[in-house]
């Protein structure tokens, strides 16, 4: 064999090996990307956003469906989040097909916008081990299981309460819940962002853990409904 011919064979062999290895690596990466994340969780965090305070924030001003004048909305469902016992729960656990219009129409009474419904399904619902239909049925059932005192949900004037006072009012309105089932979250300006209720996967109430979060301010403000 001529020297030049052997060199060409050697180069061709090396290139073939590189192509095969690259193809196998690409297939491996593609397979790993398609594998859903671990969706195990300890409990649900039912998050209820306080609309008047959300609507006073820059992001809320841009949302007329929730924040338009005359809407008279108090607490609305932000989401039902799978939660870890000692850490945040899983998110974005798999491919999220668009939520059907029939599910959206059943859920708009609870979650005020279609875009938020789609977002909650993609980010949190895919980690619930439920179909979209069953997940949003669970969202509605969870919300219906919780009573919000009228002086919190529809205050006629601005309220200032400590996080503990907000949680105590919720506990009093839901005597079958442990007092530790409630948490508050707040904006940096001191307005109430949301209340969080801890529920087992079967929706029975339970005590929250530190992973549920807690407002660290001494007082939170609730604006009157509009």
What role is predicted for each listed range?
Residues 17, 37, 186-188:
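Sterically constrained small-residue positions within well-ordered secondary structures
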Residues 1-5:
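N-terminal secretory signal peptides that target proteins for export/translocation
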Residues 30-55, 62-66, 108:
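Aromatic-lined ligand-binding clefts that engage carbohydrates, nucleic acids, or primary amines
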Residues 6, 10-20:
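Hydrophobic helical h-region of N-terminal Sec-dependent signal peptides
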Residues 24-28:
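Boundary at the C-terminal end of the N-terminal hydrophobic targeting segment
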Residues 47, 59-226:
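Domain-level detector of nuclease and nuclease-like folds
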Residues 21-22, 36, 61, 93:
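Hydrophobic alpha-helical segments
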